[in-house]
Structures are given as structure tokens and as C-alpha cells.
Amino acid sequence: MYAVIKTGGKQYKVAAGEKLKIEQIPAEIGSEITLDQVLAVGEGASLKLGDPLVNGAAVMATVVSQGRHDKVTIFKMRRRKHYQKHQGHRQNFTEILINTIKA
């Protein structure tokens, strides 16, 4: 069984037992969270689409860790003008383990 969930402005296809890095959510490590914005649920050849969400569907997950992604370096330069600008960014994430999918 799989589901398509929406969290942090992005959509993810998940199945039970998968680990996933999503945008940071305020939750303690080891706590169980419920992701209730389920867009689709499928099993085998059957697929249940929401309009826009599937009624009564939820995905239960456990928070494994909180962290930060690798640094992304931004470099701007104007040729012949001696203008150079360096900037870096590290995005926070939450790693979750999908426990069950309730449809």
C-alpha cells in the first residue's frame, strides 16, 4: 500500500517502512506524528484519489531525527566590475519513518 502526502509545500509518495526527509516540523525525536493531508491512496491496481484530499485517510509516522542538509553555495559575479558575492544556505529537515497508512 502506498500514499501520496503533502507536507511543507511538497508532495511525497510513501509506503510503510520507508524513511523520508521532509521540511522541518516542530516535533520531538521519537514522537509519533499524523500526516492527514493525503492526496491519494493506492494498493495494487486500485487507486483512490482525493478531491483534493482523501476523506478519513492518514499516515502515521515516527520522528527519527532533526538536522540540516548540506550547504548550498551561491556565487554572484559581474564581469569586469570587480563585484563578487558569496552566500551559503543550509535547510533544516526532519527525518521520519512511515509506520502505517490508514485509508
Swiss-Prot record:
The record's listing under PROSITE patterns reads:
RIBOSOMAL_L21
GO CC, sorted alphabetically, is:
cytoplasm; ribonucleoprotein complex; ribosome
* Highest taxon above the source species: Bacteria
Cross-referenced Pfam families: Ribosomal_L21p (PF00829)
Per UniProt, the keywords (alphabetical) are: Ribonucleoprotein, Ribosomal protein, RNA-binding, rRNA-binding
UniProt lists the family membership as follows:
Belongs to the bacterial ribosomal protein bL21 family.
Query: In its UniProt entry, what is this protein called?
Result: Large ribosomal subunit protein bL21
- In its UniProt entry, the species of origin is given as Polynucleobacter asymbioticus (strain DSM 18221 / CIP 109841 / QLW-P1DMWA-1)
